[in-house]
């Protein structure tokens, strides 16, 4: 057996073509860790009706950003960057929750490599049962069904890690520098939304998001900022205020310069490339916002990779 440690990166995934949008959405809407639609035995039927209606619209979103999600390539690049930082004792693998390579694919590859020790690193900084929880549950389910024996440890959050905060703060400072006068900029932190019921049931996601914002603004220094939530996916009550409503409120208040800071996203994908850059960008322009700029995503930025490497080193001890 190999003495290497497998570094398993857990990520949501995304369609790798327009034809993959429908199956991707079906996997998403049938995952009861992320959304419960009626009784369990009816969820696949209800999900199919929802997805059949939504898929054409979502396909158009992906068409506008190149016809697919870049999340696989970006996650694999993060894994390669981590391998370079961590050395030859580690080998990276990727497990996407709703696309390929799947958790089954990743564990099979680890087994073929003869590796017995696995560090599962969730690429969601802020813990939620809908994201990290779902990915970890899927990993445990696959392990149980396959009977595979691995020594596994989990990294399930890093919302307050000093290097993560430093990496985010660096992006905010760079974004502010793109404006003629940084003092006249509203910093808008936009996090992925979550059903309000999750928070009421004890999910720590909102607390983690708020703490990240507080720590980033501590480093950035003075500046007007607000927190909002994007990507609502059902009719139940979700976290508020929404990003759309926040942009509208800023415009009504006479704000002309918005710096959008994506939170809970460590890589570019549809929420940044389409939702913020295109959808919200067009809305902001129509409302009279003169400068609408998004901070660069972390992707494989050196500070972010250092953060992940530090998390892995700690877990490997």
UniProtKB/Swiss-Prot annotation:
EC number: 4.98.1.1
EC class of the enzyme, as a word: lyase
Main location: cytoplasm
Keyword Acetylation: no
Any one GO MF annotation of this record: ferrochelatase activity
Keyword field: Cytoplasm, Heme biosynthesis, Iron, Lyase, Metal-binding, Porphyrin biosynthesis
GO biological process: heme biosynthetic process
Keyword set includes Transport: no
CDD domains: Ferrochelatase_C, Ferrochelatase_N
Residues binding Fe cation, per UniProt: 192, 271
Pathway: Porphyrin-containing compound metabolism; protoheme biosynthesis; protoheme from protoporphyrin-IX: step 1/1
GO CC terms of this entry: cytoplasm
Reaction it catalyzes: heme b + 2 H(+) = protoporphyrin IX + Fe(2+)
Alphabetized PROSITE patterns for the sequence: FERROCHELATASE
Record's subcellular location: Cytoplasm
HAMAP family with a match to the protein in the record: Ferrochelatase
PANTHER family: FERROCHELATASE (PTHR11108), FERROCHELATASE, MITOCHONDRIAL (PTHR11108:SF1)
Family designation: Belongs to the ferrochelatase family.
UniProt function note: Catalyzes the ferrous insertion into protoporphyrin IX.
Name of the molecule in the record: Ferrochelatase
Lineage: Bacteria, Pseudomonadati, Thermodesulfobacteriota, Desulfuromonadia, Geobacterales
